[in-house]
Amino acid sequence: MASKEAELEALLYAAGDDGLETENLLQLLEISPAALRELANHLKDRLKNDENSGLQLICINQTYKLTTSPKCGDIISKFFQKDLSKNLSQSALEILSIIAYRQPITRVEIDDLRGVNSAGALQTLVWRGLIKVDGKKDVPGHPNLYVTTDYFLQYFNYESLADLPVIEEFEADDNPVNLFNQDDSRNKEINFDEGE
């Protein structure tokens, strides 16, 4: 008879990319939440410390998954013909952060925030699996709504969107600033005399 840890590993393997939610695992394994955490931590450590294992155990949004280990990233990348180790461009990172903090959001809303077209970088992010289309906005034209994926959380090592760093909100100052105040000694008259 298999151990509970072996059963957990087999269930997660069988579940594939979708993984299994905590509640499902508790029912299937017939164990307590504390016992599941202990099993999961032991399995995670065993996979991490086994130099012959190409797998890792992760938990994202209360869903446990077996995934390939980052130490095997090069060969997996070669297999999928996607260079996942390649850095994202500055514009892609900017778009990704906008989506992460404002999701669901349309391309036009992203373009308005950035002031430039974002279509190309959006396609790159979709192709890399970091964002996805999650429905349509109920406005004329019914544009796609973009959200981050579980792979986004995995890629940046977050368990949920609540783990994202908090960004201070900047409120617009209602009082306009006069950049060329006459009383400001820094705004001296410049003399363009010839020969100087």
UniProtKB/Swiss-Prot annotation:
Natural source organism: Lactobacillus johnsonii (strain CNCM I-12250 / La1 / NCC 533)
SUPFAM superfamilies for this protein: Winged helix' DNA-binding domain
Described function: Participates in chromosomal partition during cell division. May act via the formation of a condensin-like complex containing Smc and ScpA that pull DNA away from mid-cell into both cell halves.
Record bears the keyword Cytoplasm: yes
NCBIfam families recorded: SMC-Scp complex subunit ScpB
GO cellular component terms listed in the entry, alphabetical order: cytoplasm
Gene: scpB
BP GO annotations: cell division; chromosome separation; DNA replication
Subunit structure comment from the entry: Homodimer. Homodimerization may be required to stabilize the binding of ScpA to the Smc head domains. Component of a cohesin-like complex composed of ScpA, ScpB and the Smc homodimer, in which ScpA and ScpB bind to the head domain of Smc. The presence of the three proteins is required for the association of the complex with DNA.
Name of this chain's protein: Segregation and condensation protein B
UniProt lineage: Bacteria, Bacillati, Bacillota, Bacilli, Lactobacillales
Disulphide bridges, residue numbers: none
